[in-house]
A protein has these predicted regions:
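PLP-dependent enzyme catalytic core of the Aspartate aminotransferase-like
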Residues: 77, 81, 330-339, 345-380
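Active-site PLP attachment segment
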Residues: 214-248, 263, 352
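A short helix->loop->beta-strand "cap" motif at the edges of active sites that frequently abuts
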Residues: 114, 135, 189-192, 217
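Conserved glycine-rich beta-strand-loop-beta hairpin in the small C-terminal domain of fold type I
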Residues: 269, 285-293, 304-317
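Structural signature of PLP-dependent enzymes
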Residues: 249-254, 272-294
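PLP-dependent aminotransferase-like
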Residues: 90, 108-165, 185
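N-terminal small-domain helix-loop-helix segment of the aminotransferase-like
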Residues: 2-97, 104, 271-274, 291, ...
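Active-site phosphate-binding strand-loop segment of PLP-dependent enzymes
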Residues: 142-206
Length: 380
């Protein structure tokens, strides 16, 4: 049986690294995980308790495609709490993770063959989802001077859309209001659609994360319960779309997904009020971030932009290698630390970069830094 040309997507390298780390653990080794952007904490205890109680009284069948009304209303209220925005809950769409939101957004906004810009380095699945939908991803090389974020002068002509992320994966850098406003304005002047990936909002350490909705209502905003709310495996996310796009998205969602998992929606609703636990998680990430900023240079990784948010550091390792994939494999084998090659995020320049995640427990971060230091000292 033949495969479609659309199925020729690249592997998600971090998942391959995870599998190599799992195999090492199965062989009896202790591995420190700095490869994956997955919180070391579970969904908040209060959220899990709410689901347990609901399961005793509710069959948890299909919900409406846009999500349970209570959750959409609570998400809308988050925009008041975080950004002082009055958001109509009717514009909120609950999705099966942010990946589901991107599939819906790309399907609603673009036609086959359209060109969609994305900053590089950037989240690799943008490119692969676009290709699978017969769209053309256009990588936009960013610079260290602009903290690895695109600026209007970088945008090529002919784009049907632009995707940005702030805080960004893999760099953790953020777009301030002026920078975001300039990008949205330039995109709209081109007649292109603007998609803002905001899944790391809530995880910021230097300044406030700005939502694209503070600039314009004529944008798509994607968010998720995976990161700030520690719900990666629950596959629950959301997006906010212009009022006149809601019905379009609803029709596509009805046919593609029916609904986001009901159990995950119940859990997500309760998670949004578990403030003490969420704040405690953020304090751990802040401590881990400082450990990494201080410890990575001592280990020999001193070329990176300090992250404003998320839980990653993206380091230039050109002084050590021209093959980040082989270098990451060497670090896993000899140091017992799993890290992600930059090729996942930048297929052109990523052979000289690594991403380090500090989402795990603080004791793991300390041990990982100690191992990296010993490894680099031994490597010469």
């Amino acid at each position: 049986m033949r495969n479609s040309s659309r199925s020729s997507v690249d592997p998600f390298i971090v998942m391959d690294v995870m599998e190599a780390a799992r195999a090492a653990e199965a062989a009896g080794r202790h591995i420190i995980h700095m490869e994956v952007g997955q919180p070391g904490t579970p969904a908040p205890a209060g959220a899990r308790a709410a689901l347990s109680a609901t399961m005793e009284s509710d069959a948890l069948g299909y919900t409406v495609a846009l999500g349970i009304p209570e959750l959409r209303e609570r998400i809308a209220s988050l925009y008041k709490d975080w950004y002082n925005l009055d958001l109509d809950p009717a514009r909120v769409v609950v999705t099966p993770g942010s990946s589901g939101a991107f599939i819906l957004a790309f399907t609603a906004l673009f036609d086959a063959g359209d060109k969609v810009g994305l900053g590089e380095p950037g989240y690799p699945s943008y490119r692969q989802i676009l290709r699978a939908l017969d769209l053309e991803p256009v990588g936009i090389a960013t610079s260290a001077e602009n903290r690895l974020q695109p600026v209007p002068a970088d945008l090529p002509p002919g784009l049907a859309g632009l995707i940005t992320a702030s805080p960004a994966n893999p760099s953790g850098t953020m777009l301030d209001h002026d920078h975001l406003s300039a990008l949205i304005g330039a995109t709209q002047d081109m007649g292109a659609s603007f998609i803002s990936d905001e899944i790391y909002h809530g995880l910021q350490y230097e300044g406030r994360a700005v939502s694209a909705l503070e600039v314009s209502d004529d944008v798509y905003v994607v968010n998720s319960f995976s990161k700030y709310f520690s719900m990666t495996g629950w596959r629950a996310g959301w997006m906010v779309v212009p009022e006149d796009h809601v019905r379009v998205i609803e029709r596509i969602a009805q046919n593609m997904f029916i609904c986001a998992p009901h159990a995950s929606q119940v859990t997500a609703l309760a998670a949004m009020d578990c403030h003490d636990e969420l704040n405690a998680n953020l304090a751990v990430y802040a401590e881990n971030r400082q450990l990494m900023i201080d410890g990575l240079p001592r280990a020999g990784f001193d070329r990176f932009a300090p992250p404003d948010g998320a839980f990653y550091i993206y380091a230039d390792v050109s002084a050590h290698t021209d093959d980040s994939r082989a270098f990451a494999a060497e670090i896993l084998e000899k140091a017992g630390v799993a890290v992600t090659p930059g090729l996942d995020f930048d297929p052109v320049r990523g052979h000289q970069t690594l991403r380090f995640s500090y989402a795990r427990a603080t004791e793991d971060i300390r041990e990982g830094l100690a191992r990296l230091t010993r490894f680099m000292e031994g490597r010469g």
